[in-house]
Curated annotation (Swiss-Prot):
Species of origin: Cancer pagurus (Rock crab)
Sequence repeat residue intervals: 1-17, 26-43, 70-87, 95-112
Protein name: Cuticle protein CP1158
Keyword Transport on entry: no
MF GO annotations: structural constituent of cuticle
Keywords for this protein: Cuticle, Pyrrolidone carboxylic acid, Repeat
Tissues with expression: Calcified shell.
Any single Pfam family the record assigns to this protein: Cuticle_1
Modified residues (Pyrrolidone carboxylic acid): Q1
Length: 114
């Protein structure tokens, strides 16, 4: 992991930055560190892979759909006309719940009824 005071390498070794280097850091990017004095640091492939790890996708949030008087949540839909329980596979495939539908990772989106 790359931080503002040093690097924990994939092999577990710690690299401590000097006080001057740490205070000159302007930006940490996926492949290196940019400093105000031009003494930039290029990360090794192993160090860069720690920075490039994909963040966990956001969890779907319960969403109130006013036109339907329904609540769409991460595990299903509760509506006056009946409830729909999502399968584990479908729930894991959800990217975004919006007022008119659900966007999925595989492109098989679900249109909500008006």
């Amino acid at each position: 992991q790359v931080g503002y005071s040093g690097i924990v390498s994939p092999d577990g070794n710690n690299i401590q930055f000097t006080h001057d280097f740490a205070h000159s850091i302007v930006l940490k990017g996926p492949s290196g560190i940019v400093t105000s004095d031009g003494k930039n640091l290029q990360l090794t492939a192993g160090q860069a892979s720690l920075q490039a790890a994909a963040p966990a996708p956001p969890l779907p949030v319960s969403h109130y759909v006013a036109s339907q008087q329904s609540v769409v949540g991460p595990s299903g839909i509760v509506s006056p006309s009946g409830n729909v329980q999502f399968s584990h596979e479908f729930a894991d495939n959800v990217v975004l719940v919006g007022p008119s539908g659900i966007v999925t990772k595989d492109g098989n989106n679900l249109q909500l009824r008006a």
